[in-house]
Amino acid sequence: MTKTNIKIAPSSVISYGGLDCIVLDVEQDKILVLAKESIGNMPFDEGNSNNFPKGTLCKYLNGEFIKTLKANGADTSALIPTTIDLTSDDGLKDYGETTQKIFLLTCDMYRKYRSIIPNLDDWWWLATAYSTESNGYASLARYVYSDGSLGSRRAYSGHLGVRPAFYLKSSILESLSPSLSEFTTEELLKEVLRRNAESTETE
């Protein structure tokens, strides 16, 4: 199969398991990506907990969602377990840290990469709690408004979108396809022809 050289830099878009992802950060041996669009609306936790690793959304992302990526052709061995800080937005550290293959951005991560994260016509969850259960706030989780500002919502709300984030091993880049949205018209035509040729070869 012909390899496609992908120019990877922050704000680039790649396709992984059929999911278009924005590259947020490039390190020596890994890249951080965020889903370009929401994968759908769902609760942070059906039981109304704002502690991310205990929630149904975290379990879905690291279970069924990974299976879906794999079914769509993703090399899921390239997913890197990542530890994120669950310090609440008011500074409480009750929830500690969690290590997951697929996660939501925290408020701090969102602020760090805000300039290259496009707004969506949707609200979407972050992993950070507004405060914690010990302070009387067991259910409020932070989220991003459609204009990019932040708000808080009860975790059982099913009306907010989900943008999965994850680290990939840099070595996988040779096998990834660039997102078609990244091409000029001329490049798009060449890429479509290339993919059609590859499809014909494998039939």
What are these regions (language model features)?
Residues 197-203:
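Short acidic DE-rich linear segments
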